């Protein structure tokens, strides 16, 4: 999509993609944001600074070496003061009800709540399955069958106690920790969300997001 900057800093109508993501968070009442930054991460800090002019308080957790998605969470842990916190990918934009995740975490007494989304062909992804009560029973499960199904949407609400179980080093949340937590019997659950979703990792989606911003689908 872009080669001179981190993907989340790709410009959309003169603003980095990540500004649209943070705006959505601020609108949802989230005003304390920790950026887990690696490649050209100083570009993120130079743009957002302390975050105040964007309506939030910003901290930056730098990675000396790539730590993977779970390793990055552990590395950012030194800035986390709350007992629970949201985690999301900076190169995806997903409109969800964040208070619903909080309610779910409390009502099912979960260690982590996550958002799933429905796709027309689940064989292209790893499938994530919830039971009728909302508990996660399978994650990243491969299927050859080209059919409709649910996959990981990439937004999580996690308890600090769960973060403390992530080992040091390069660790993947999706491939290492979530499957391990399921095996260990941790309480993971979620809901399927049908809000606007886009991942700008592919050029067509990047162009689509630009168009959606121009047409005020996203503001």
Tell me the role of every PLM-derived stretch.
Residues 84-86, 93, 99-106, 120, ...:
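Catalytic-core segments of class I nucleotidyltransferases/pyrophosphorylases
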Residues 42, 74, 179:
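Active-site phosphate/pyrophosphate- and oxyanion-stabilizing loops and adjacent acidic/basic residues
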Residues 31-33, 57, 111, 187:
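Residues at the starts of beta-strands that form the adenosine-phosphate
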Residues 1-45:
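N-terminal glycine-rich phosphate-binding loop and ensuing alpha1 helix
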Residues 13, 68-71, 153, 173:
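A generic structural signal for residues located within well-ordered alpha-helices
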Residues 45-46, 50-132, 165-167:
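Conserved beta-loop-beta/alpha segment of the NTase-like Rossmann-fold superfamily
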Residues 9, 128-130, 178, 190:
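A structural signal for short hydrophobic beta-strand segments in well-ordered beta-sheet cores
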Residues 9, 60, 112, 188-190:
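Conserved beta-strand scaffold positions in the cores of enzyme catalytic domains, especially
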